[in-house]
């Protein structure tokens, strides 16, 4: 009987395809750079001049040019898309509102995190366990999600969110704290306020 040996497959750290298939993705240039830094032997096997010449020898010159133009166009589109997403993330801000419920009780509302691909339910659960309070995810009037946390933990929440965004490489994102107080009931004209 022959012994079955598992084949070890090496995956790209950029697009998560095997390096032989990176050319079908949209970030070939970054994939090549990553492969050259992490596995020079495989890079030489796939992208050396000899390897490229043998792969393209069966294609006509016109077809080769067309393929390279399409690939360059795809790469430019993908780079522009990633740049737009990064600018959108950096331009947005996280808003932490401290809302007064009663005289001494507060709720904080955290909104603006949906842009950063953060799982709101997991974050609410983390806040609930970290701050030992109740936390939930609700929808706002404009159909965006926000996290409501009971208690005045806005400073701690701000620190945690800044650390979370920093881990994602988004240091320039603004995290703003706002105090929102309930409006007091207006007394009728001529009536004296109760003491």
Swiss-Prot record:
What do we know about how this protein assembles, alone or with others? Interacts with the 40S ribosomal subunit.
Question: Per its UniProt record, what CDD domains does this chain match?
Answer: DENR_C
Q: Where is this region: Disordered?
A: 176-195
| PANTHER family reported for this sequence | DENSITY-REGULATED PROTEIN, DENSITY-REGULATED PROTEIN HOMOLOG
Query: Which compartment or compartments is the protein found in?
Result: Cytoplasm
Q: Which UniProt keywords apply?
A: Cytoplasm, Ribonucleoprotein, Ribosomal protein
Give me the disulphide-bonded residues.
Answer: none
Domain SUI1, residue spans: 94-165
How are the domains described in the entry? The SUI1 domain may be involved in RNA binding.
Q: Name one GO biological process term.
A: translation reinitiation
Q: Name one GO cellular component term.
A: cytoplasm
Q: Does the keyword ATP-binding apply?
A: no
What is this protein identified as? Translation machinery-associated protein 22
**What NCBIfam families does its record include?**
DRP1 (TIGR01159)
Q: Principal place where this protein is found?
A: cytoplasm
Q: Which GO terms describe its molecular function?
A: mRNA binding; translation initiation factor activity
Homology family:
Belongs to the DENR family.
């Amino acid at each position: 009987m022959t012994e079955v040996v598992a084949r070890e497959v090496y995956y790209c750290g950029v697009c998560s395809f095997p390096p032989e298939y990176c050319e079908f993705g949209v970030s070939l240039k970054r994939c090549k750079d990553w492969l050259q830094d992490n596995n020079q032997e495989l890079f030489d096997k796939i992208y050396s001049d000899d390897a490229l010449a043998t792969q393209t020898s069966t294609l006509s010159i016109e077809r080769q040019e067309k393929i390279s133009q399409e690939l360059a166009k795809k790469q430019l589109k993908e780079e522009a898309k990633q740049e737009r997403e990064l600018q959108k993330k950096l331009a947005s801000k996280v808003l932490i509102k401290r809302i007064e419920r009663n005289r001494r009780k507060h709720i904080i509302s955290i909104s603006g995190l949906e842009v950063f691909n953060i799982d709101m339910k997991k974050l609410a659960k983390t806040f609930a366990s970290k701050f030992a309070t109740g936390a939930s995810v609700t929808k706002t009037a404009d159909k965006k999600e926000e996290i409501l946390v009971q208690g005045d933990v806005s400073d701690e929440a701000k620190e945690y969110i800044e650390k979370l965004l920093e881990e994602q490489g988004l240091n320039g994102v603004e995290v703003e704290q706002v105090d929102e107080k309930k409006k007091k009931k207006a007394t009728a004209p001529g009536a004296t306020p109760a003491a």
